[in-house]
From Swiss-Prot:
Protein's cellular compartments: Membrane
Classification of source organism: Eukaryota, Viridiplantae, Streptophyta, Embryophyta, Tracheophyta
Gene for this chain: CYP73A14
Name of the protein in question: Trans-cinnamate 4-monooxygenase
Transmembrane portions of the chain: 3-23
Pathway: Phenylpropanoid metabolism; trans-4-coumarate biosynthesis; trans-4-coumarate from trans-cinnamate: step 1/1
Origin: domain of life: Eukaryota
PROSITE patterns tied to this protein: CYTOCHROME_P450
PANTHER family tied to this protein: TRANS-CINNAMATE 4-MONOOXYGENASE (PTHR47948:SF4)
Membrane topology, record value: Single-pass membrane protein
Enzyme class: oxidoreductase
Amino acid sequence: MDLLLLEKTLLGLFIAAITAIAISKLRGRRFKLPPGPIPVPIFGNWLQVGDDLNHRNLTDLAKRFGDIFLLRMGQRNLVVVSSPELAKEVLHTQGVEFGSRTRNVVFDIFTGKGQDMVFTVYGEHWRKMRRIMTVPFFTNKVVQQYRFGWESEAASVVDDVRRNPDAAAGGIVLRRRLQLMMYNNMYRIMFDRRFESEEDPLFVKLKALNGERSRLAQSFEYNYGDFIPILRPFLKGYLKICKEVKERRLKLFKDYFVDERMKLESTKSTSNEGLKCAIDHILDAQKKGEINEDNVLYIVENINVAAIETTLWSIEWGIAELVNHPEIQKKVRDEIDRVLGPGHQVTEPDMQKLPYLQAVIKETLRLRMAIPLLVPHMNLHDAKLGGYDIPAESKILVNAWWLANNPANWKRPEEFRPERFLEEESHVEANGNDFRYLPFGVGRRSCPGIILALPILGITLGRLVQNFELLPPPGQSKLDTAEKGGQFSLHILKHSTIVAKPRSF
């Protein structure tokens, strides 16, 4: 850092300190704020709680300060909600007031400051984007149209694993093949495209760029520059990398997928009724002037992250729990054999006849929630919550993982026990009918991808279990299920090697 930058930084810190003290005194008189650790000027609670605001750390703070508490992270207010009643207020009762999204400096880059659907503020743009995305992605008609493709992709996974001699011996990192499956599931819907193998050069490039985007966005290491704007110059290099990755991804989406589809469609006559895949609907909306080219690319961006990676995380967690609980794995296999008969491969319509498999999926989503804090909410204006004043533009985090793992609300929540969803919690569904269990959120800003994720999870886990005995690698009794949290993600830290011993029918 040169001397001039240092002088400017120190001067800025001094001015920020005076401003923070003045604002704090004014707000203290005006607002009845939620409880929380006592902040210090400039830094707020950042030096006390650190960067890693994962679900478990926030749970520990909730045990100290209550079901609603406030963290002042530099200039940002974070309100954390940890009870079903308050979650209902945020997501349902006051869904409009808290219906916007807050973005940080990195998500501003990757979403074009909210030109997408997931991270835009609540308003006309969000309603338009949600409407445009619903028809080609999030309806029962889409499920019925594409479930054959999902079943075909799952069958290809089974065939490839059977042919791999390492699978039944030392084991393989099954996630790698499942990642290809998930890309094919979603790229069939988006572009009527698929990748032939893990070595496909375009798939390799796409996977690498998406992985780098996720790493950069989910990291906690840039929080200091987001919380304390005067420190943002120190993020210059980090943000430069983010911008480069963003531009490369959007260019790849445009050159290899969107433009290719437009060329294909220009060679034939297509009516609205004949549209084959999602991008056709989206490009039609662009032609009508409802959205622009950037919006089209950010829709593709959302699907690459929100649909592919999150479902893959849940599949990986489900496999790990089944490997570590062989008695549960056997119950799933026995149910499939008994209900469908040996050799009849699980299909999407079969899921309704397989309650124990459904319970395993629910339990995976409860204990290993892919988005444990949901996607953060924000109130555009001053609001009330739980008897407290919530300043405008506060970041609202709903600790959905703790709602689903609080022993005050669940029987032995630390156990992986699918039976709970057939016994004492048999009424609970993943669609948000119970505010203790919100793996996809609920209300206006809930995840519409639930309609795709649940059948894909069922088909994938069902076919793996009915075709293989899934085991830890030689020398291990269990898989390592250590967690890796992100800004609001939860996935397994180590991609485990799995032994898959084929069954004979």
